Curated annotation (Swiss-Prot):
This is Uncharacterized protein MJ0905. The lineage of its organism: Archaea, Methanobacteriati, Methanobacteriota, Methanomada group, Methanococci. Transmembrane segments: none annotated. InterPro entries: ArsR-like_HTH (IPR011991), EarA-like (IPR010863), WH-like_DNA-bd_sf (IPR036388), WH_DNA-bd_sf (IPR036390). It holds the Pfam family EarA.
Length: 111
């Protein structure tokens, strides 16, 4: 199923942050399973606080309105006291639409 329309705020959010895009593509690779914060951080090679900012928003640097969770692309599920982040079905559809446009970006990622 393809999307006829992608919210411009999603495009803006992903274009403003390579880290948001990396996290989104990592979670797409893990779909339908989730992954915890420190593992995301390790795989995208970024500080956990920056990863959390991309996922949930952070004062100043990462606007909460453009966070992956706020945009409906990622969800946080708590299992046994551990927060697991996973791509939503909507997030999966967005990535599938965008991945052809981002083929050069995807090839540059080294998991």
């Amino acid at each position: 199923m393809s999307l006829a329309f992608i919210d411009p705020m999603i495009i803006r959010s992903l274009n403003k942050s390579k880290l948001r895009k990396k996290i989104l593509y990592l979670l797409y690779k893990m779909y339908p399973h989730g992954i915890y914060l420190s593992e995301i951080s390790r795989r995208v090679r970024s500080d956990p606080s920056n990863v959390l900012g991309c996922l949930k928003g952070m004062n100043g640097r990462y606007n909460g309105h453009f966070s992956l969770i706020e945009l409906g692309l990622v969800e946080c599920v708590e299992r046994g006291g551990v927060k697991i982040y996973k791509l939503t079905d909507y997030g999966k559809k967005i990535v599938e639409v965008l991945k052809d446009q981002d083929s050069d970006f995807i090839e540059s990622l080294r998991w």
